C-alpha cells in the first residue's frame, strides 16, 4: 500500500473524531492579583462595545454584535445591533451586572430574581450559588428553575484586539429546568 493511500485512509478514519471535538476556550497567562484590586466602573449612557460571537463547538463566527448602554434608571438597558445595523433584543439589568433579560442564549430568557453576570467580589477566593426562576417571552406563566454556581478561577493577562489587559477569570456551572419536559438533566 503506497504512502498517499495510507494517509488518505488514516485521515478519513480520523475525520469524524475531529468533528466531535469542541474548540477549547481561550486562556490567558496566569498572574498575581493586582494591587489594589480594581473596581468595576459604573455604566454610562452611550458606552458601547463590539464583540465577535462564535460557536464554541466549530469555531464558526455567528455574528458581530455591538452593545450600547441606552438607559440608566430603575433598570439599565443595553441596546444591541448586528454588523448590518439590524436591531437585536435588548439586554435588561436590574442594577449594573445583574441581568433580568438575558440575550446570550438561543432564546431570550427573563430571570426573576436577576442573576449576576460577574462575581460579586473580585477575589480569587470567591464563589457562590444562585437560585432563581426563568421564563421565556410569550410563555411567562411557565417559570422554570435555574441554579447557577459561579466561582473565580484567578487573575490572568489576556490579549484582545483592543490591547493587553489583566482580567478576572471565572466559571459558571448552570443546572436548569428545560421548557421541554422530555429534556432532563440540563447542565451547562
Regions found by a protein language model. Give the residues of each.
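Conserved functional acidic sites
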Residues: 34-160, 164-167, 174-185
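N-terminal export signals
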Residues: 7-26
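Short, low-complexity, disordered segments immediately C-terminal to signal peptides
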Residues: 23-36
